[in-house]
Structures are given as structure tokens and as C-alpha cells.
Amino acid sequence: MLGWVQRVLPQPPGTPQKTVETAGPQPETESKPEANPQPEPEPQQEPEPEPEPEPEPEPEPEPEPEPEPEPEPEPVPEEAPPEVQALPPEEPMEGEGEAEAGPSLQETQVADPAQPTSQAQVAVAKVNRPSSWMLSWFWRGMQKVVPQPVCSNGGQNLAAGERDPDQGGAQIPEPCGTGDPGSAEASGTQDTEPSLWLLRWLEQNLEKVLPQPPPPSLAWKVEPEAAVLDPDPPGTPMQMEPTESPSQPNPGPLEPEEEPAAEPQPGFQSSSLPPPGDPVRLIEWLLHRLEMALPQPVLHGKAAEQEPGCPGMCDVQTISILPVEQVEHDLVLEEVDSCWEDAQQEDGASPQETEVAPAHEEESEAIVEIPRELTKIQEEREDEQEEDEEEKEEEKKKGEEEKEKEEEEKEKEKEKEEEKEEEEKEEEEEEEKEEEEEEKEEEEKEEEEKEEEEEEEEEEEEPIVLLDSCLVVQADVDECQLERTPSELASIQELPEEKEEKEEEKEEEKEEEEEKKEEEVEKKEEGEATNSTVPATKEHPELQVEDTDADSGPLIPEETLPPPERPPPSPVKSDTLTVPGAAAAGHRKKLPSQDDEAEELKALSPAESPVVAWSDPTTPQEADGQDRAASTASQNSAIINDRLQELVKMFKERTEKVKEKLIDPDVTSDEESPKPSPAKKAPEPDPAQKPAEAEVAEEEHYCDMLCCKFKRRPLKMYRFPQSIDPLTNLMYILWLFFVVLAWNWNCWLIPVRWAFPYQRADNIHFWLLMDYLCDFIYLLDITVFQMRLQFVKGGDIITDKKEMRNNYLKSRRFKMDLLCLLPLDFLYLKLGINPLLRLPRCLKYMAFFEFNNRLEAILSKAYVYRVIRTTAYLLYSLHLNSCLYYWASAFQGIGSTHWVYDGVGNSYIRCYYWAVKTLITIGGLPDPQTLFEIVFQLLNYFTGVFAFSVMIGQMRDVVGAATAGQTYYRSCMDSTVKYMNFYKIPRSVQNRVKTWYEYTWHSQGMLDESELMVQLPDKMRLDLAIDVNYSIVSKVALFQGCDRQMIFDMLKRLRSVVYLPNDYVCKKGEIGREMYIIQAGQVQVLGGPDGKAVLVTLKAGSVFGEISLLAVGGGNRRTANVVAHGFTNLFILDKKDLNEILVHYPESQKLLRKKARRMLRNNNKPKEEKSVLILPPRAGTPKLFNAALAAAGKMGPRGAKGGKLAHLRARLKELAALEAAARQQQLLEQAKSSQEAGGEEGSGATDQPAPQEPPEPKDPPKPPGPPEPSAQSSPPPASAKPEESTGEAAGPPEPSVRIRVSPGPDPGEQTLSVEVLEEKKEGAE
């Protein structure tokens, strides 16, 4: 009858339907209302309902948005074998059986039966009326055609409780499984009212056929099937609000896409029956169930695929918390309407508000999950969402490509700007190119690193989030009691990638913690500070918001910000929400003005906050980062301000100095005077290396003997050099000496051995030994020395071994050396030992000439060697002539004629004597008689005349060159004497001139050094001047502290002049144009009233005349007479030359002027000199004597001794007046002399005093006062004895000295005159 319904209703495609029934029936009992456990929030929505084609009496309201559906299973009769509907577990009643189920996928927890609930379970009563039988028949017929769900746990048998036929025939199946024993019991009681059965049947079938909304993401594959809402306990803000409906209908069960990996969970029991006998609550329950069945708004998440039907029947099912497939890396948080947000907050069951707790929680929880099957519509929507996500990924990729293009355009613009700068600055082109290449390489590396970091972050940040809704109920089960079920292990095996990613994340976090302990401590402190008010607990979970686009592409190619480190997971919950970072670039964009401080800011303000929200500029983490950047910028600005203040101070000081210089350019402070920079010491080697080196040196330089220990030079100093300098190497000249000796052996003895019979069989070995020794020397010279001689090529000295060898092999000397070493000695075997075969050894004459040149270059008196060499030439010519004469005599016959040698005496000496007489043409020789003798004699004469004429002329040249200087000196002296005689110069002056010539010639070896210096370049003149004069000039106190180069320039301008004894170097009053430095000898500075007193004597190294030369003090006249004491050699520096030098050294000029001012000021200061006393110093007068003297003065002439004391007082008065007059006269004489010699020049030497100008007396001496005070002020010496006189008058004596002060010729001068009255004095005595 109802078969057409089955054909019309939609069936799930390709879904196998299985029915598993329990073998033993179980009677249904009426369930009592029990308290339901507190549900956890569900992040899931129910599928949209679809209109049912079958007519129903109940009207369907319009779909209303419901944030959280609460499905509950309905009990169904046994007569529906194709499909079985699952009932939720109910609270156990007294006396009822308990159904057991395995532990859940993640954790099995025990539900608390004592928790309160706002929903009561409805018991199903028995129905015995006929209407109930009719309804049960209609119900069984509808279940045959309506698809039924299957229990998600296919491997578990289902238990169903059957009703007796006499009670209505309807059977209510028992739940598939329950939690722990005693936690839940399934009671299947039959409803007594048929209307309730009809309503339940309509509700159940509507939920089956209507489409359900998909879950937010594909990571959850199944949904909970039923839930009972309880009031939210305090402290759990994320749980749902309680609902008023007592029970809720159950939508069609959903089947997981891949496999039912769920296990039954305890703790959730509910009845889907409506409340009996309460029409108001019945209407509310119906409306609530319809709202749950109607379609709901869908979030942008991917739901798991579901199928409409599944065979089998199960009341309580569980789902796997671990995701089966990961499609997205992160959740996407998007903006929603305010009305929807309010509804979500009111219902408390929005999937966006709830997140899945991690696998390990500190608080014990019982998680019960009821799976739901997906419909075909959900699969289609799932595919659409996948396509949407792919489109979003493509858009992201396009955005990244656009960003890369923009970066490339920026790089191109930068390159253009750099090219413009290169055109302006051509000198810096190479450096800029290198910098550009380095920047490009760094950018490429940065991009590669960013891509790698992005991939790693994507892998690391793939959250293992469970997107299927579930109900979480707390229980009193510890974590140690939890175990994993086989279904959970199966689900874990299906996800190896997630496990590997977890392990990689853990390893990376461990490594980061080990490497950056300090940073982690700071981060923990910051995290504690931020979470101090609200700790991360279940009531206040820790939320981390990350930017999905922050690391998708490089924002700025110049910067590479380190990715934010992932914080360690919270002990309660660590959920991650990903926010699209559209505006992230704006926060990290580097401004053009920040180029200088970008790296500092990047290094000082990294992203260290554990919670990062790039899209929200008002987050406390970003505000903290901005504060850090601001603090860094403030530090940099403070440093810059300090530096600017320092620069301002320096500029002010410099301005003040310039003003002072403009006002008085000569006045400088001591601080401005340049100080010689201390010579930098060479860096000392490490102390650890010093002992080792010292030990090695000791081992090399010292040798221990039995008696003593002596030092020797290291052996490495005797190693043969790689190259030899033929011009300066003395060892090479010594080697040439040995080569010349070997050459002379051959040249002198080969003719002797050939002509004279000195080579015999008994001494042949001696001759051969010497011959081969000379050959060995020749061979060494060719192979060792000549191959290592340096030479000049293109102005460079070539020291390369190959180049030196090639140069010698190509030279003419090598050819001559080869000829001289021709091995003609092998002919001895055939021709006998003939000395003429060694004649080619004489071809090494080039070594002889080279030796002469090198030796003359190093000899101080080369003319001596030249004379010796010329004499040797003459002797060698005589040697050859004597050998030829003996050979001619032997050819004619010894003693055959008077002309030949007669064989008497030493043959060589007699022949040499004959050769000397013949070549010199002395005469007295016997006349030749034969034609051979006549020709031989003619050749001797011609050779003698030519040889001796050349020799004599060469000898004259040698001697003339040796005496050329003396000749020049004589010619100059003769010319000077002739000049003085012509002008009739006095003889005394002529003698002084002659003395000067002789002393100058003997002391210097020449009359004028400048003539020799003119031919030399400036560098050589400077070198010579430094060696000769620097040691003296550097000791001058005036030039100490001056520029070293200025002293070098001054050395080249110095002239050497010799002064004879008592010659005036300079006279007082002359114009000073020269400064003098004493090289040798002494000078005396004269002064005093007559100008002949020797004030000081200056020695070598002293300088004088500098005050006039520097023109300090307003004049440049000489202030004293300077006379040479003996022969004195002085260096003279002209004022013009000094000014030309000081122009280039302004600092030294200021220093010299300052020193000259100081010297002049010191010379003008008077020195306190002790006055010459006329009377010797007297001892102090005793107090008793002074008292007696005063008393006697008061008594007057009445006292017995009054006359004697009065006479003594008068005498002391006279002596004091004489002493004062003498002192005043001396002061006047010194004042007059100082005025005449005012401004006298002082020497720069420390021991050089200058004429002092004593100060004039401020107050002229006054005439003595009354006798009594003067007598008291100047008492007589203790040793003085009063003279006794019997005829002395009684009255006071008259004064014997008169002192008068009269005005002088000048208005400011006074004349002091002293008169002594001799007559009165004599009469008094």
C-alpha cells in the first residue's frame, strides 16, 4: 500500500543498508525523568531540511536561523528491518539492564548522573486501544518504505528491546552501546497515546528526507546525533544556553564519508517523545524541532560528506576527534552580520564560538560524540566549497605574482636611479655595480628563504582542528584511566602526515628552545604579564590569531622579517584562528626615510609576541611592537642629538679660534702648538710565542764548549743568495778578485812555461793542479755567479732566476767564457803537455775589467789603484818582452852571438833586464847581427815607444786627477793673493785670508760645497744634508716640535761658513738677515758698558740671531756683538729662505713666533742680583747693646758714658750713608748700560743669558733723618770698639757726609750726589 512512498522518496546513492538486531528482546519500561549532563558547545550546524513529498497534517513553518541544532533519536518499532533509527541513551532506571560500549576514540569518561537538567525524559506508555493498533500498523508500513539510519559502529551488534504483541506490537530498539557500566540504561516503553506516535513519526521522517546543513569544515566528518541542553554553569562562557523544550526530535542520522569510526559514548540520554498531557509544551517542542529541521545559514567551511541512509540501528554513537582529511591549513575568520552574532551569543551554540579541545587536557572530561551521516546535497556543497577554496588559492597566487611584479618594477626603478647616479659619479661605477650584484643575490636568497619559511610554516601551522560538532561533558575520570579504542587507532593510522607534522613541530620547538633560551624567558615573562589578569583556563582559553597572508610573499624585498615563533601549547586549550592579512603590508612597509635605521629597527624589534594579529592595528601585541620600535627610534634620536650637540660645540670653539686669529694672528695658545706625534711601536708578538722564539734564537746563536759558551751567527745568514747585485754586493767583488787571480795566473805563467824551461817532469803535477784549480774557479763563475746577476730592464731591476739566466746566456761575456774553457787539454794525450794549449784561458779579460770598475767604485782613493794598475800594465809588457827574448835566444842558440842570451845566471831576470833596456831605449846594448835579430829588435823599439808613451801619459792623467783638488785650491789662493796685492790690502788682512783658505781646505777638503751639490738632484742633496747636518739641527731647542719636513727643507738651504778667531759674526745694531747654527767651534756674546764683556759662550748645536730673523718685537736689528772664539764653522740660514719655507708650514711658523716672543719676554725680565757691599756684612747687634744705646741717647751728654755713645751713633750714621750712596751709584750705572744695550738679543740655548735691564728705583733715597733714629736703624757691628777721645766737645757732632738729590738732564731722572767732609772728619778724630 505504501510502496509508492518508497519509490517517490529519495534514496542514498550506492549506500549499503544493513540491519543488525539483537537476539534477545528486552521489555521496555517507562523511563523516569533524569538529569542530563551538561553539554559542551557544538561548533556545528544541522543540515538544511528538504520538503517532503508525502503529505503530513502538521504545517511546516518557514526556515528560521538556528545556530545550534540539538538532534535526538526516536525509538522505532522492530517492523522496520531495512533501516534502523538510533535512539539516544537514556538515564538508567531502577531495576533495568545496562548496555555496555567500548571506550571512546579519544578518551572515555564517566558521566555524572547527579547533574541537573532542564529537560525531562518522556516515558513511553503501553497502548491497548484499537487506534493505537491502527497507528502501529501504519507506522510499520511507513518504516518499510522510509530509509532508516545504520549504526555507525558496524562491527558492534545492536541490541533492540521488543514489545510483546499483545501490547501493541511496536518494538523500541535498545541503544547500540552505552558508556561505563551503570552509567546508562535503555528503556523502550511504548507510548499510550497514538497522536504522540504519529507526531513522532512525522518529525522523524521529515528530518530524514529534509537536507541538513553541512558542518563548517571538512576536517570533521561526522556530527553528534543527539544532545540535551542544560543550563550553563558559572565559569563556562562557551557553553550553550538552556532551552525550554523538554525533548527534541531527531533528524535523520548521517553516515560518515569514509568509514564509521565512532564508538558509543556514555553520558547522554534523551527521549525524542513529546511531553504528555501539556499542549503548550507540545507546541513549543514541535516548533523547536521544526526549527532544527529547517535549513540554517551556512558558514564558509567545508563539511564532511554525508550519505542519507545507513543500514543498522544504533542509539548511541561516537565520532573520531582526529580529522580524517585535512583540506585547509587554518580556520578563516570572516565578518558576519550583527544580528547573526547576537543570535549566536544568545544560543551559545555557534560553531564559530566553539573549538575542539586538544587531546591532552589537565581537567578530566567525558567526551561523547554522536556521528551523523552526510547527504548527497552536502557532498555537492562540499565540492562547491572545495572549488571556492581553490579559487581563493588561485587568487592568492595571483596576488603574490602581482606583488612580485611590483617588486620587480621597484627593482627596475631602483636600477634606473642607480644608473643615473653612476653617470653623475663615474668614479664610483665599479663599486656601485658590485653593490647592486650583492643586493640582487641577497634578494634572491631572501626570496628563497621566504619561500622555504612559508612552506615550513604552512606545514607547521596546519592545525589539527576537529570540525565536527560534539558534546563535551565533564566527568570524574582521570587521564591515566583513559585508553584508546581500535577505531581511534585506525583513524590515527589514516593520518600519518598529521603525526609527522606534529613530531616535526615538537622537534623544531625543542631546538628553538635550546638555541634561544634567553628569548624564551623574555617571552614567557611577557606572556605572564599579559595573562596575569585572565589565566588560560577552560573558562578563558588562549586564542592565537595568525595571519595567513603575512608570509605568503615578501612584502618588501629589502627586508626579511623573521616569522613569529609559535608559542608552546597552553595546558588547557590553544586554538588558532587565521585572519587574512590584507592590510599587513601597511604595518610592515618600510618608508623611504627609514633606510638608514631599517636594519637597526629590524634587529631591535622582531615579532616576539605570542599572539600576532596583523590585520588589527589596535591589538596590544602590535602596540607593544610599535612601542618597541618607537623606543628604538627614540634611542637613535637621542644619540643623534648628542652628536649634534657635540658638533655645535666644536663649531663654536672653531669660530672663536678663527676670531682670535683674525684679531691677533701671532698670538696662539700653547694648546694649538703642534706636538710631535709619538712614533708607533711595532705590534709585539704574543707572549706565548716569545719564549719559543727566544729559545730557538739561543739554540742557533750560542754554542757550548767545554771551557766556555760563545755566540755565533746563525747558519741561515750564510745561505747563498737567489740573486746578486753586482753594484753593491761586496761578496761578489771578493769573488771577482779570485777570478782575476786565476786569470792572472794564466796570463803571466803560460808565457813563462812556454818560453823558459821551468816546467819539468818532476813538477808537472804542481802546474797541472794549479791549472785545473783555475779552471774550476772559471766554471763556478759561469754556473753559479753569472747566472744570478741582477740587471736593469726597462728601468726595473730584474731578480727572476730564469730572466737572469737568459740575460747571461745572451750576453757577449758568456761567449767569451765558453771560449776560455775550451777543453784543449785532451790534446795532451796526443801532443803532450804543451802550455800553449791553455792559451784560451786568457780570454776571461772581461772579468778583469769588471773587477777594476767595481773596486774603483768602493775605494775612497781610487787614483791609487789606477796608478798601481798602470804600473802593472808596464810590468806585464816587459814580462812578455823578456819571454820573447829568451825564446829568440833559444831559437838562435844560447850564447851563439853577443846579442842573444849567453845562459849565465838566472835566465828570467837577465832577460827581463834586457827587455827593460830595450823598451825604454836606454842604449848600451849590443847590436844585432843577423836578420832575425834586426827584425826582432825593430819590433821591440816600436813597441817600447808606443807602450811607454801610452803608459807615461796615463800615469800623468792619474796623478793629475789625484791632485786636481789641491791644484784648484792653489789656483784660487794665488788668484786671491794677486787680487789683494793689486788693491794693496793690508798685510794683516791678507794673512787672515790665507789662513781662511788653508783651514777651509784642510777641514772640508774643498772651498765651496755648493759647487758639488749643484750637480746632484734634490733627493740626493737632501740625503746628504740629513746625514751631515740633521744631527746638529735637531738638537736646536728653537726647532723642537716643528714639522719634520720643514726641517728637511731647511737643511737644503743651509750654507756652511768658516770664521777665523776673533771674527765678528754679527755686530750690535746691524740689520738681521741671517740666523746662525754652530756646527763646530765656539762663539762669544759680548756686552756690558764698553761692549767687550763676555756675557756667554755658545758651543756646537747652539743657535743665535733667531729673534732678528723672525722679526718679533717690532725690529730686526742685532742686539749684541757675537765674536768667533777660534776657528768656527757655522751654518747660515737666510731670512728669505726661511720665509719661503714657513709659507708652506703655517703651524710651524706660529710655533716659532711664539717661542721667539717667550724668549724675548724672558730676556727682558730683570734678574735679582746681589748688590756689591762696600762694608763686609756685620753680625746682628745684641738687644742689650741696643737698649743701652737708646738709654744713652735719652740721657744725653750728662751721663758718664754719654759722650762715647753719641760719638758711636754718629759714626754708624756715616757708615750707613756711605753704603746707601755706593749702592745707588751701582744701580745707576747698570741702568745706563741697560738703556744703551736695550733690546739686546739673547741666545736660544739654555745657558745663554741676555743683558738684563734692572728696574729704576721707584723712590729716590732721602737724606738721613735725625741722628737718633738713624743710629737705631743701623747699629754698629758687635766687633766694633768705640774710639776714646779725651778732648771731645760736649755738644753733638756735625754730620761728615752730605747727600743731595738734584734733577737730571731728563725730566724723569734725578742725580744723587754724596759729599764727604774730610776736614771735619779729621778734626773729629
Curated annotation (Swiss-Prot):
Lineage top rank: taxon: Eukaryota
GO cellular component: intracellular cyclic nucleotide activated cation channel complex; membrane; non-motile cilium membrane; photoreceptor outer segment; rod photoreceptor outer segment; terminal bouton
Residue intervals annotated with topology Cytoplasmic: 1-732, 786-800, 850-861, 961-1325
Region (cNMP-binding domain): 1038-1142
Residues at the site labelled Central gate: 948, 952
Record key words, sorted: Calcium, Calcium channel, Calcium transport, cAMP, cAMP-binding, Cell membrane, Cell projection, cGMP, cGMP-binding, Ion channel, Ion transport, Ligand-gated ion channel, Membrane, Nucleotide-binding, Olfaction, Sensory transduction, Sodium, Sodium channel, Sodium transport, Transmembrane, Transmembrane helix, Transport, Vision
Catalytic activity field: Ca(2+)(in) = Ca(2+)(out); Na(+)(in) = Na(+)(out); K(+)(in) = K(+)(out); NH4(+)(in) = NH4(+)(out)
Skewed-composition ranges (Low complexity): 1226-1250
Binding site for 3',5'-cyclic AMP: 1118
Name this polypeptide is given: Cyclic nucleotide-gated channel beta-1
Ranges of Pro residues composition bias in the record: 560-571, 1262-1279
Gene (name only): Cngb1
Organs and tissues of expression: Rod outer segments. Olfactory sensory neurons.
Disruption phenotype: Mice are born at the expected Mendelian ratio. They showed increased postnatal mortality and reduced body weight associated with impaired olfactory responses. Deficient mice displayed undetectable rod-specific photoresponses, developed progressive rod degeneration and were devoid of both rods and cones at the age of 1-year, a phenotype reminiscent of retinitis pigmentosa in humans.
GO molecular function (one): cGMP binding
Chain residue ranges for the region called Cyclic nucleotide-binding domain: 1044-1160
The organism of origin for this protein: Mus musculus (Mouse)
Biased composition, class Acidic residues, residue ranges: 43-81, 380-393, 418-463, 495-517
Entry keyword annotation includes Transmembrane helix: yes
Region: Ion conduction pathway, residue numbers: 862-961
Site (Occludes the pore below the central gate) location in chain: 956
Annotated region described as Calmodulin-binding CaM1, given as residue ranges: 633-643
Locations listed in the record: Cell projection, Cilium membrane
Region (Disordered): 1-124, 147-198, 227-279, 340-470, 482-637, 659-694, 1226-1325
